[in-house]
Amino acid sequence: IPTGIFNAENLKDLSLLMKKTDSILRLTHEQSFFIITNDENVDLIKNSTIYKKFDSFHNIYFNNQIACAGVNECSFGVIPNKADAIEMALYLNTHIPISDAKIRMYWSACPKGCGVHGVADIGFEGAIAKDENGSSCNGVKIFIGGKATKSVLEARQLTKAISIPKAQEVVKELLNIYKTQKLENESFESFDSRILSILSIEEIQNRIGL
């Protein structure tokens, strides 16, 4: 579910499908859910309208994604956030498609960190940045290398506040390194532990053209 945006109509359709197939819905902390069902129900669920509505988001950039409410719903928010997270995921899936991988991208619209960006593989903190003309614009600070599965570790700050379009380019270059150097089925978290964590921030910045 892209950034957890799931309205009442969607929930009604899903609940009817769960009842029809005698399935169980399990929510995740990454603003999505799993459908637990029997084998004979799989095709029926995959052919349902509600499944098809969200099927295009089933890729590594949406599967483990968190984004807090953002400026439209929260007085502390600096950027829209959810829309920015969705735009980033769509951009990356177009330019750096990866199938055998896992990457946790968490977005917080302000330094308070409700999107838990500090433990993300790649975290984003909403900020005011400068565009290429020097004008103020929505932006993010990017963090990398947070740990939240096998261990817990705070992410390192990779960039100062940069515009959203610039952030897309930066993350694309970072994930290009991941795609070309990762092991089969290696998660970004494991890749960071094996490769990126032994590099200084300056070395990583140089590799991605910052």
Model-inferred region functions:
Residues 35, 56, 145, 190-193:
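Intrinsically disordered, low-complexity regions enriched in small/polar residues
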Residues 118, 123-180:
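Mobile "lid/hinge" segments at catalytic clefts and subdomain interfaces of large enzymes
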Residues 157-210:
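Extended hydrophobic packing segments that form well-structured cores
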Residues 94, 136, 200-204:
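Alpha-helix boundary/capping detector
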Residues 1-134:
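Small-residue-enriched alpha-helical segments and adjacent helix-cap loops
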Residues 26-31, 61-70, 144-156, 171, ...:
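Short acidic (Asp/Glu) and glycine-rich catalytic loops that position anionic groups and cofactors
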